[in-house]
A protein has these predicted regions:
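All-alpha RGS (Regulator of G-protein Signaling) helical domain and cognate RGS-like helical scaffolds
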Residues: 1-150
């Protein structure tokens, strides 16, 4: 009796991973757009940090896109425009938007972590943990249920 998974189980797991990778790319695309938008509301003394987060999300997106390409999948393209869930008027609301984006990405990375192969799931967990730390750095409180909208 063989203990190897059936081809359909492997295909199903692969589809789930591809779906979550696509979701993560879409989330990082939105994060790049959002951080680019909110940079104009960040004071000069905090701009370098904000730019580093913008670049971090761009790098995360590019790594995820490469993983999809390695699987023979064309990654989702960014939208031309995104609807802001928070009206940004000043630095405080810019940090609220940044926290909202990070919270949503934490939820996506946790979903990806839950279905990934154990040898590669550390990166997803690290992305989720780093997002929670950034929320604290924005002087916001991480949500008890990461990825929740409210």
């Amino acid at each position: 009796m063989s203990t190897s998974p059936s081809p359909s189980a492997t295909t199903s797991a692969s589809k789930k991973i591809i779906d979550k990778l696509n979701l993560a790319v879409a989330g990082e695309n939105a994060a790049v757009w959002a951080f680019g938008y909110l940079l104009s509301f960040i004071p000069d003394e905090n701009k370098n940090y904000a730019f580093s987060i913008f670049n971090l999300h761009r790098n995360n997106r590019d790594k995820l896109r490469l993983r999809l390409r390695d699987l023979g999948i064309t990654p989702p393209r960014p939208k031309e425009d995104y609807e802001l869930p928070i009206v940004v008027k000043d630095m405080v609301s810019a940090y609220e938007l940044a926290s909202y984006v990070e919270n949503r990405l934490i939820g996506i990375y946790i979903q990806l972590y839950a279905i990934e192969n154990k040898s590669i799931r550390r990166e997803s967990l690290q992305c989720a943990l780093d997002g929670a730390i950034r929320i604290l750095e924005f002087k916001q409180t991480p949500m008890a249920l990461p990825g929740s909208i409210t």
